């Protein structure tokens, strides 16, 4: 022990103190951007195997963005989900069939701490999903200089079926997926507001988080800004990254689900059903759907792919 603390803890405190006092590339090269908060929304983050809330390349890229932002000195704030069961592990049964096995992550053993409001209170944030509220609590993960905030619906305020909403990455049917993505996008914005964080730039890592743009539109319209001007401002301050041209990698929902869970929003925006659905309408061979990537592309001022060729194809 050193001053009552384990040696490892003392080393980490000394390391953090040393790193925090060093100038970063951003503070030296573009000091005007050093303290500009960037909100980075992603359905998964691959930070470390002690926090298994990722399934593949989308999460690994998100984790690398957090780490690189820390190294550069960019004030990046990640927003995602705390999945206690994470993504499934593959196992073969005795007869050679693939089985999906989920392992439970004990929050007390993970590198998490409760996220606190500016008043020092544990954050419990209500999120409107249709005619109901789903409540989320928030966990904080330090990724060097960057921060990651993970939403968790497993709280007493929720019904049992809502408590399971954030249990697994990419689990459930389309009903579960649209509810989860409403919480990620709309709930994520409200979480940042509750924590006193005001981003200047909003980055959507794939279309899963595209409902961020709908919540921000609502904020502007409620503040008295005309919808056309609100759309322009959201586009000016929002960017997105798309990861695959493969249709299975893009979420699209039937109109009736969008109506069921988001109908209060077109009333708050002062528009009708058709105008709202037009934000994300895409025609498939079987008919029209509400496409999350189309929503992201229409509501952002810049979009990129994960490579030059992929960006051109997408």
Where does each model-flagged region fall?
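Catalytic cores of carbohydrate-active enzymes across secretory and cytosolic contexts
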Residues: 1-314
């Amino acid at each position: 022990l050193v001053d009552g603390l384990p040696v490892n803890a003392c080393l980490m405190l000394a390391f953090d103190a040393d790193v925090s006092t060093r100038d970063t590339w951003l503070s030296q090269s573009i000091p005007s951007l050093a303290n500009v908060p960037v909100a980075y929304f992603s359905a998964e983050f691959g930070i470390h195997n002690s926090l298994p809330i990722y399934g593949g390349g989308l999460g690994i890229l998100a984790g690398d963005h957090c780490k690189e932002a820390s190294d550069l000195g960019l004030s990046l704030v990640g927003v995602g989900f705390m999945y206690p069961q994470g993504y499934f592990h593959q196992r073969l049964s005795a007869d050679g069939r693939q089985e999906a096995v989920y392992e439970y992550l004990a929050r007390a053993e993970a590198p998490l701490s409760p996220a606190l409001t500016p008043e020092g209170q544990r954050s419990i944030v209500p999120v409107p999903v249709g005619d109901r509220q789903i409540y989320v609590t928030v966990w904080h993960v330090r990724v060097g200089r960057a921060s990651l905030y993970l939403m968790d619906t497993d709280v007493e305020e929720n019904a049992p079926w809502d408590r399971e909403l954030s249990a697994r990455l990419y689990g459930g049917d389309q009903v579960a997926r649209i509810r989860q993505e409403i919480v990620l996008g709309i709930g994520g914005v409200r979480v940042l507001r509750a924590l006193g964080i005001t981003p200047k730039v909003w980055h959507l890592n794939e279309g899963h988080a595209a409902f961020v743009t709908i919540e921000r539109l609502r904020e502007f319209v409620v503040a008295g800004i005309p919808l056309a001007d609100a759309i322009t401002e959201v586009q000016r301050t929002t960017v997105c990254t798309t990861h695959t041209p493969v249709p299975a990698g893009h979420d699209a929902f039937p109109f009736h689900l969008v109506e069921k869970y988001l109908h209060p929003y077109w009333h708050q925006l002062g528009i009708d059903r058709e105008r709202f659905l037009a934000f994300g309408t895409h025609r498939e061979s079987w008919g029209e759907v509400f496409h999350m990537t189309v929503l992201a592309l229409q509501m952002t001022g810049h979009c990129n792919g994960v490579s030059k060729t992929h960006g051109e194809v997408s």
